[in-house]
Amino acid sequence: MKLYDTFSAAKRVFDPIDSACVKIYACGPTVYDLAHIGNARSAVVYDVLFRLLRELYPEVIYVRNITDVDDKIINAAAETGQNIGDFTERYIRYFHEDMDALNCLSPTVEPRATAEIDTMLQLISRLVESGHAYVKGGSVYFSISSHRHYGRLSGRKIDEMISGNRVSIDAEKLHPGDFVLWKPATEQDIKLGAAWESPWGGGRPGWHIECSAMSYRYLGESFDIHGGGADLMFPHHENELAQNMCAFSGSEYARYWVHNGFLTVNAGEKMSKSLGNVITVRGLRNSGIEGAVIRYVFLCTHYRKPLDWNEKAIFDAQSALSKMRRSCEEFTSEELNSDIEAVGVHNMLLEALKDDMNTPMAIAALHALVGEINKTTDFKERLKLARVLNRSAKLMGITDGFAGKSAEEAVDVDKIQELLERRREARNGGNYSLADEIRDQLHSMGIVIKDDKDGVTRWSRA
């Protein structure tokens, strides 16, 4: 398996720290609003990676955090008059419902920032004691100048940090690029339940220390893969990396850094509230677009490439999914899904996913399977191929198992083959009356037959 590693700017063979247990961390939602399709794309990307790793390794621990305290949450909660716990609970529930609709597996662990304050305080204390952080006016700042490797992940130099995203100029800072680890609580913070005691006074954590603490708590000082959107590379991931490398001498933090590309709408337009073009998963679902279609649109573009969301992409996804489902509809659910985990995944699909999660190539393999199913005349061979399609689509999360027909609609394949053989013999012997009777008998059983030009008779359920 190969993954593109942002840190080394190259596709690398995946070599986990411990092949018996692969560990992955992905940045999750900040729960102050409904999940939009940019959030959803990232979730689907790392869900596919989680599924693939589970296919290849005996154990996988996937941690995806929930940021349930930050400036946006506090401001939004203040507008409603709720404390941050009550306010975020609703959006966490909505997020989980959306993820279920997209068929994203639950992560192994889903920590909330507000439940991990003690670990954050522990890390901040280590950074202060080691000289990588300093206290000014009740705030604690990380000193980027203290970390000689700062900027290597995003390819930036310390002198350029002042122009970086989310970097504010503050007279308290020793360097404009220094970032806050702990900030003093305001009256509003206290009122909304967004303040905790610390050695530096009442306050709340900075954004970056939250992920450092949660990854450390559940995955240790070093782990295999850190994932997130390309927009998080700087400053968030750069700062996470600096914090953990400085808190734990000798730690590499994450062995591989994986970033999914940006998402635009309607021919390259950036989503923003000011433009009024933010598309939420819930909004799409309420308009009748099923989660499988949303997921399929994401998978049609390689995760590292920009993705443009538009009506044509939705239509194409709906059409493609319909073709897959139709290729399996003659079989019962039991035929398609019984002991499905024992069915091998399509080799071309698996190899595509192992090559830096090449989902477009994997989808092409699925449609090649659909073509084989549709041109195969033998029922048992079609069923065999359909089960491979079902298993392979399940690996990608496109389905949890194609539905097929109910058990009551099952047919006796051996009986059908016997009747088809009798009909062939009747036709060859010129007994067309008997051949027609057998055709009618098959029709009464719900079986439609078609005689091809080459003399092969195909059958399917009506």
UniProtKB/Swiss-Prot annotation:
Q: Where is this motif: 'KMSKS' region?
A: 270-274
According to the record, how does the cofactor bind?
Binds 1 zinc ion per subunit.
Per the record, GO CC terms? cytosol
The protein's required cofactor(s) are namely: Zn(2+)
- Sorted UniProt keywords: Aminoacyl-tRNA synthetase, ATP-binding, Cytoplasm, Ligase, Metal-binding, Nucleotide-binding, Protein biosynthesis, Zinc
Record motif 'HIGH' region, residues: 29-39
Give the lineage. Answer: Bacteria, Pseudomonadati, Pseudomonadota, Alphaproteobacteria, Rickettsiales
Its recorded name reads Cysteine--tRNA ligase
Residues noted as binding ATP in the record, renumbered to the chain: 273
The primary site where this protein sits is: cytoplasm
The molecular function terms of the Gene Ontology recorded here are: ATP binding; cysteine-tRNA ligase activity; zinc ion binding
Family per record: Belongs to the class-I aminoacyl-tRNA synthetase family.
Q: Which Pfam families match?
A: CysS_C (PF23493), DALR_2 (PF09190), tRNA-synt_1e (PF01406)
Which positions are annotated as binding Zn(2+)? 27, 211, 236, 240
Cellular localization per UniProt: Cytoplasm
Catalytic activity from the UniProt record: tRNA(Cys) + L-cysteine + ATP = L-cysteinyl-tRNA(Cys) + AMP + diphosphate
